[in-house]
Amino acid sequence: MKAGTKILCCALAALLAACGCQPTVDFTPASAPEIHDGDIVVLDMNRWREITSRDSVGVVRLWETMHLAATLQGIVNRDEPRLYIKYVVANGINVDDFWWDKCVGDGKWLDGRNVVTMYDPVKVLDAFHDKIQGLVVYDPAIASTSNVASTVAGADNLVAVRYDPRPGSIYTRLTARDYPVKVWLVNEDGSSKFHTKLEPYRWAVDNYLKTGKCSGETAAYYIDQYWMTAPGNAGMNHHQLTNHDYFVSHKGFFFDLSPWDDEPASDAPTEGNGDRAMFQSIFSEIYKLNGGTRFCHVGGFAPWAHKYSNNSRVTYKSKHEAAQTEWETVKLLSAYNAYKDADAASLGAMANASFWQHYPVKPEYPQGWTTVEDLKAKGLILSNGRISSTKKFILFYVGDYDAAAWIYQQMPMLWEDPARGTVPMMWSINPSLARRAPMVMDYLRSTATEADYFAAGDNGAGYLNPGMLEEPRPVSGLPSGVTAWAEHNKPFFKQWGLSVTGFVIDGNGPGMSLEGFKSYATFSPNGIGPQKLPDGRQAMLVDGMPILRCSGASIGDTRIEDAGQKAVSMLSQHPEFPFDWIRTILKSPTWHAGVKEYIEAQSKNYVVLDAPSYFELLRYYLEQQ
């Protein structure tokens, strides 16, 4: 075993040594109710939130129990919704309860189905034993084997179990029930089968990607069991095991790797810097599975609160900031026709996507647009055919909704704000989030006001760098993905009535050329907002599509006066150009209404517009230049 892995694994092993003890709290009822075909089982895991980061025994029990539940759920829910978990809380709201109450029963979806509540995932496994083939057992000393176990679980219909022969462990309970171990990622005597971080991934690539046992449709970028060394870094639900179910259901490949090749990975500091090469090897194989015409949906995010960044909480610090690690990850994914569904810390926990994937949505959710005649009627185009030379037209870009976990967690608070409908807001929500959270998307559309307009968030139907799709392609050298990206986006934009892509993050990748802009014009004809434009331009028109440069700066101040002052400062940076927008992240309608009132009080020339009026007026302005 190499020294770097040994150092970290010894620390993890010390934590796990306590596992011979019983859990701090016994969460298992004496008996479980019987279930029948068609019943929906609700697995209530709310009491596991009582575990704290200081409870080393409880942390281990939490990990192994959640891992069992998530991999079981992904398999059980693959073909129909049967197993629902209650666990995730955000802003004081149990969001699993919230979406269940909004969308299930009483004249809604699944009305009439019998619901059985259970508390112990082992007994839930007993109830659904016919759905699985056995166990995949992984090594507590080699952290990466936990992610490989989730890969194997989905491909082989197994549940993931951490090796621990002590009394009370999940492993002991299941082997005592005679569940067969079908795949060992640790030797049967508990000694390590693999000895470095990357060895298990090489094995998984050879046995599950190259053989086609995994689907190229999805992949999953979630922290491995290294999480247990510092569980308090990003919230106790940020093991993100609850997120695994969807990707298990879709036979996705799980990984946790650094995107950098200029330093060793934080979790293997003396093993060299091979993570990036392994990252590329994985996605090269996924690209082959997809034939260069389909895109891979990658859930998750670089675990920057634990690894691969210079964040103060990281034990072995990177020299790179968290945002740079995010951008480098997206650059790599983009090079291989993969996009991110960015479940980022510390709002990244989401349960039940494998359940909700079956939620029925409408074929189309149309949205209206505006016309030049409408703009004239509103006085936005003057009688002389020009627009005012003194006005500054402003749009609220409301984001960053590029993660299913974020809309799952945050919309129960933000969307229910009583001020919604009093201020025009361009909700920029990535339409591909409908794969994991279709009920959220449907609920937003069904309850929207005239002031709520929807655009695609970064960067269309998935978060990637579109400039990385153009030949010659950096990193991968693969053929152009520009046309394939447009074809990927078109059905999403049609179904969700979208014609604007708000913020296009170019990140560490190159900006788009004319080819890329023309491609976006085929599915986002009413506007896009990239970070990078040629020749330092602020705006341009391509095939009738208005393009407005967005620097990426956002206003995060909580106090309205502070936010308003910053907004006014930003709006004064380009006095010669009559259009600007204010990008916000996870801000409420009440906040937006307050900022609107503040900036309009500073000058009668500040005019906040709805998205259709804004982009149609921008198009008209650019056509006149």
Regions found by a protein language model. Give the residues of each.
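Bacterial N-terminal signal peptides
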Residues: 9-18
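A recurrent domain-boundary module in secreted/ectodomain proteins
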Residues: 342-372, 612-625
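Substrate-binding cleft of extracellular glycoside hydrolase catalytic domains
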Residues: 430-498
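Bacterial Sec-dependent N-terminal signal peptides
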Residues: 18-28
